[in-house]
Amino acid sequence: MASTTPITMEDLQKALEAQSRALRAELAAGASQLRRPRPPRQRDSSTSGDDSGRDSGGPRRRRGNRGRGQRKDWSKAPPPPEERQESRSQTPVPKPPRAPPQPPQPPRMQTGRGGTAPRPELGPPTNPFQAAVARGLRPPLHDPDTEAPTEACVTSWLWSEGEGAVFYRVDLHFTNLGTRPLDEDGRWDPALMYNPCGPEPPAHVVRAYNQPAGDVRGIWGKGERTYAEQDFRVGGTRWHRLLRMPVRGLDGDSAPLPPHTTERIETRSARHPWRIRFGAPQVFLAGLLLAAVAVGTARAGLQPRTDIAAPPAPPQAPRAHGKHYGHHHHQLPFLGHDGHHGGTLRVGQHHRNASDVLPGHWLQGSWGCYNLSDWHQGTHVCHTKHMDFWCVEHDRPPPVTPTPLTTAANSTTAATPATTPAPCHAGLNDSCGGFLSGCGPMRLRHGADTRCGRLICGLSTTAQYPPTRFGCTMRWGLPPWELVVLTARPEDGWTCRGVPAHPGTRCPELVSPMGHATCSPASALWLATANALSLDHALAAVVLLVPWVLIFMLCRRACRRRGAAAALTAVVLQGYNPPAYGEEAFTYLCTAPGCATQTPVPVRLAGVRFESKIVDGGCFAPWDLEATGACICEIPTDVSCEGLGAWVPAAPCARIWNGTQRACTFWAVNAYSSGGYAQLASYFNPGGSYYKQYHPTACDVEPAFGHSDAACWGFPTDTVMSVFALASYVQHPDKTVRVKFHTETRTVWQLSVAGVSCNVTTEHPFCNTPHGQLEVQVPPDPGDLVEYIMNYTGNQQSRWGLGSPNCHGPDWASPVCQRHSPDCSRLVGATPERPRLRLVDADDPLLRTAPGPGEVWVTPVIGSQARKCGLHIRAGPYGHATVEMPEWIHAHTTSDPWHPPGPLGLKFKTVRPVALPRALAPPRNVRVTGCYQCGTPALVEGLAPGGGNCHLTVNGEDVGAFPPGKFVTAALLNTPPPYQVSCGGESDRASARVIDPAAQSFTGVVYGTHTTAVSETRQTWAEWAAAHWWQLTLGAICALLLAGLLACCAKCLYHLRGAIAPR
């Protein structure tokens, strides 16, 4: 965190005396300069630092040299007082008498103004970097393009009244990771990481140094340095803090703006002064705009604005139908009753769930049935040729099971004891022989509708319900306006505050999947503007209006300025002839180097190059969980790397023994002796206390009775075996990770167009060649990247992290957000926990699993000779230190930072009429998977032939154009197999696995009356004008501008006829 150096009283006294003499000399020199007339202030960078520390009125106390505009290394110490005195003034200044000794105090500096230091609000401080931000500390401004040092150490001071006369010196530095600081709004980039220099200070000093404090007591100046003084309390103890400030201010000295000149053209006319006073064109345009807004507001207030069209849905009974409605309300619609849920469908001779049988686009909506009271006819919907059709069945017998009837309208529920239908599929046949193929389910719009369906038969007829109509009304003739529903079609889905709307419903605003409906003038104006002024319309207006306005301005300026004849001649007679393209050819090119195609000239992808701005982020060594051990056919007396040198390797054992959080265990397996000797079991119980008493060791000694001792074989009467294991977290010398930051990344595509080399990027996707212009649809660049170059025992590989790391969010503990060293000698992260060792037999079922985090399993292995055994060691993950380990890098990075989503699109424009070659050979290995006449696109894949683009057709229907090579697309199929595929010439048969629509289809059932309404297709001129009012308005404006332009040109030609056509 920081380094502390206690200062003694004697050192402090000497420093204060030397500083006092220097400051007095500076004050005397400054006072003598103030008496003389001051030269005008310059903007030079060499004098900006001296002037910034002085005020214009009177000999005020000096606030220090802020050094604005200077490009010095602010980590260096200032020059001695003698050099400063000689450089400032050559006149001798009498030295004041020495000040008497004073009690210990902070370094004497000249006070300035007080105030509050602004600082960014980045939340509560969780690390030293955020704590520095919280207390207003800012890094020095650094330009990454210059050859300036990336690190600079500065010194701050910290002392407390409770600590006596001890002053703590805090050294810290800022590291620039290569991004430009954002100093326009007073903030700085979070990528500038804050890192203190030196070892860890005492805990209470760190807590006091990182304590946020916003109040600034004063600004101190010491030579060429500037400090901010703060005092605060931590746990009842008052602390003082002097923070070093940047040498250059955040605002800086900006250059003056260049002079601006405005040229005014006189437009007054002595003959027609009213044109200037009243502004007739402006009045006309304003009136036209108000008229358009009024028309749009009126149209939006009388009818809803719909953005999407609703598909057909079950029809509804008339609102005055049935005697059951006479008891409640004559305008209530008849709602469906509860039916069966789940949807069991009959497919062939079997019943299956709807979710297993339904086509894809039907699963996106609801499916089911309405149960209505009148059973004179039933209705269902069929789907074929990607359209919905209504089917009607007449004379359906009524049910015999009475159930309560429920109606709901305007949040009113009532039950009527009447004869009600049974579940919706009751009374239907289980099989249907001659039904129409291609039937599908119906989709309901409201969550309150029941969902059920079954395969039935019916006549194929088309039907359409009357449309929904609205009106506007007011309560008691006063605002606000309300929307009243005149007729409602339930499948439109209009709701008021979540409740379905019915005829007679009044609501301020209605909402449906089709749009919004309102009578409020403000809402109507917004709806009219949002629906009429779309992005396409705005672009069309700009494209149509801006060129005419520019030409009008050019002609008007040419008529009123000198040199009008030459300007108008250049515009009218010469003009500008844009290049005339004979033909545009479009094709695709794969993204692998070496791919080629015809456009119609040959185009080949020579290579792909990756460019970026690289900033070195340092190098670190990850923690490595390393373990070793040995299986010994006796009981050793010296359990250490030296005592077990014959069984364990010396170098790894020493590295592990000297590692961090060492764990070592010595197991005595079934330790006993026979043939008259005493039992050795108690020699290792409890916890090997007797063994450690005679053989001191730093490892744990544990008995392992019951474990297999077959590894040491050949001694049927006397078997002694022991296992030693050692594990710890170490810094492996051959495992390092180097971090590099890639900013301003760009992908360069190297193309060869008819032998001419060309490079295209996202910024410049064009190639201008002698044969024509080639426009390339280039994928977007990957953005900022972080490269981890991992070197593990000679095997080097790179991993890439997408985007910049969020070091103040979830990535605060990642390796990239830590401070690294150039020589890879620094371990990343906190010290891991101690690993756990475990002895496991070879036949233990535990070996079927993997060791847990921080666990090491050791298993004895039978040797090839007597009294020879080995050891199998399995180490698990790194425990809680995984975030600093290679596993974290693999989990948060990728091996390929950039992969294009598809082929490159090539648009070739040539000045000569050409014909793009088309492939005539049939495609190969074409497979069709899915269904036909079901509304779901089928999957079509295969290989397109060479020789040009393949315009693929399936049974005569166009599917799309594909470059040579493999293609995968989706297409709606209307014909059954077999499928003939072609590229425009010879055809071939494709293999197909499609679903039979007859076995796939089913119907949703609707019981009740059926109302048929045929919509008229005639349209009056007034209706057409109301539907195209925006286009008419835009056309009228363009016509007026064109008329004004022609009049202006005619007037200019009349006055300049002598210059254009002299007699």
Swiss-Prot record:
Q: Which residues cross the membrane?
A: 535-555, 1029-1049
Site described as Cleavage, located at 300-301, 582-583
Q: Mind telling me which Pfam families this protein's record contains?
A: Rubella_Capsid (PF05750), Rubella_E1 (PF05748), Rubella_E2 (PF05749)
- In this chain, composition skew of type Pro residues spans 93-107
Question: According to the record, which residues are glycosylated?
Answer: 353, 371, 410, 429, 658, 759, 791, 1011-1012
According to the record, the residues making up region (Human C1QBP/SF2P32-binding) are 30-69
Please note every region of biased composition (Basic and acidic residues): 70-87
Mod. after translation: Structural polyprotein: Specific enzymatic cleavages in vivo yield mature proteins. Two signal peptidase-mediated cleavages within the polyprotein produce the structural proteins capsid, E2, and E1. The E2 signal peptide remains attached to the C-terminus of the capsid protein after cleavage by the signal peptidase. Another signal peptide at E2 C-terminus directs E1 to the ER, with a similar mechanism. Capsid is phosphorylated on Ser-46 by host. This phosphorylation negatively regulates capsid protein RNA-binding activity. Dephosphorylated by human PP1A.
Q: Which residues carry this modification: Phosphoserine?
A: 46
Q: So which stretches are on the Extracellular side? A: 301-534, 583-1028, 1050-1063
Cysteines joined through disulfide linkages: 153-197, 590-595, 619-824, 641-653, 699-712, 758-767, 807-817, 931-934, 950-983
Keywords associated with the record: Calcium, Capsid protein, Clathrin-mediated endocytosis of virus by host, Disulfide bond, Fusion of virus membrane with host endosomal membrane, Fusion of virus membrane with host membrane, Glycoprotein, Host cytoplasm, Host Golgi apparatus, Host membrane, Host mitochondrion, Host-virus interaction, Lipoprotein, Membrane, Metal-binding, Palmitate, Phosphoprotein, RNA-binding, T=4 icosahedral capsid protein, Transmembrane, Transmembrane helix, Viral attachment to host cell, Viral envelope protein, Viral penetration into host cytoplasm, Virion, Virus endocytosis by host, Virus entry into host cell
> InterPro entries attached here?
Rubella_Capsid, Rubella_Capsid_sf, Rubella_E1, Rubella_E1_1, Rubella_E1_2, Rubella_E1_3, Rubella_E2
**Is Magnesium among this UniProt entry's keywords?**
no
Q: Which PANTHER family match?
A: FORMIN, POLYCOMB PROTEIN PCL-RELATED
Q: What is this protein called?
A: Structural polyprotein
Question: What organism is the protein native to?
Answer: Rubella virus (strain BRDII) (RUBV)
